[in-house]
Amino acid sequence: MIGNDIVDLALAKKESNWKRNRFLDKIFTTKEQVLIVDAENPEIMVWNLWSRKEASYKIYNRETGIRGYFPLQLECSSENTTFGTVTIKDKIFFTQSRIENGCIYTIAVIEKENFKKIVRIDPAVEIFKKNGIPFIIDFDSNMEKPVSISHHGRFWEGVTLRD
């Protein structure tokens, strides 16, 4: 399983005032808020953690069928600005984020080894949905292949896992 998320930092800055009263309390656990306050660039940390939660939520939703808005149930632990984990209930997701070209891009997987199997999807590839969950058709096997799609502002990314 794979999930991804992308944040256009310019758009996030324009549309979301993360410093407003109680914003952090509604989205981030106490532990995550400490990471934000202690960060060299708190704004980048806000969107880095948000991106990790969103990418992990996509896997959680696909695995459990549970949809909803519960960011406080997804808790990030950060090894560094690139690698970390997100935990929800008894599930752990591994995340890898990169910050470049005005965006934060995160991929989440259920096994660390899956980072080696990531394949980017060409935006021209036809993407289908079943119950709101995206997939592509693998033309070699004619089988459905799960994908994760994310877009925000100027950015779009799609990924799947190589067999």
Task: Annotate each language-model stretch with its function.
Residues 1-163:
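Core catalytic alpha/beta fold that binds nucleotide/phospho-ligands
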